[in-house]
Amino acid sequence: MALTTEEKKVVLGEYGLHETDTGSPEAQVAMLTKRITDLTEHLKTHKHDHHSRRGLLLMVGRRRRLLKYVAKTDVARYRTLIERLGLRR
């Protein structure tokens, strides 16, 4: 379920502040969102994979905390990030 290096480069190139950015909240949230969508697709076919389900819940919680931090520090950045990722419909 891990992302390949190419997938990481695509996500970080699109959402990172610069090419090698991996630590900004936007990059971290984008990476978590990609992993969450991949894991959600996996769980649709493997309904009894409870170990992965727990990992999914941990990732969702981490993403929620990062989004809370971005919203607290810069609301405009938060709104653009939410809109770009397609969260909070």
Curated annotation (Swiss-Prot):
HAMAP family: Ribosomal_uS15_B
Biological process annotations from GO: translation
PROSITE patterns in alphabetical order: RIBOSOMAL_S15 (PS00362)
GO molecular function term, any single one: rRNA binding
Keyword RNA-binding part of the UniProt annotation: yes
Family in the record: Belongs to the universal ribosomal protein uS15 family.
Cited CDD domains: Ribosomal_S15p_S13e
Gene that encodes the chain: rpsO
Descriptive protein name: Small ribosomal subunit protein uS15
UniProt entry keywords in alphabetical sequence: Ribonucleoprotein, Ribosomal protein, RNA-binding, rRNA-binding
General function of this protein: One of the primary rRNA binding proteins, it binds directly to 16S rRNA where it helps nucleate assembly of the platform of the 30S subunit by binding and bridging several RNA helices of the 16S rRNA. Forms an intersubunit bridge (bridge B4) with the 23S rRNA of the 50S subunit in the ribosome.
The protein's assembly and partners: Part of the 30S ribosomal subunit. Forms a bridge to the 50S subunit in the 70S ribosome, contacting the 23S rRNA.
Organism domain of life: Bacteria
Keyword Repeat assigned: no
Cross-referenced Gene3D superfamilies: 6.10.250.3130, S15/NS1, RNA-binding
SUPFAM superfamilies: S15/NS1 RNA-binding domain
Record's GO cellular component terms: cytosolic small ribosomal subunit
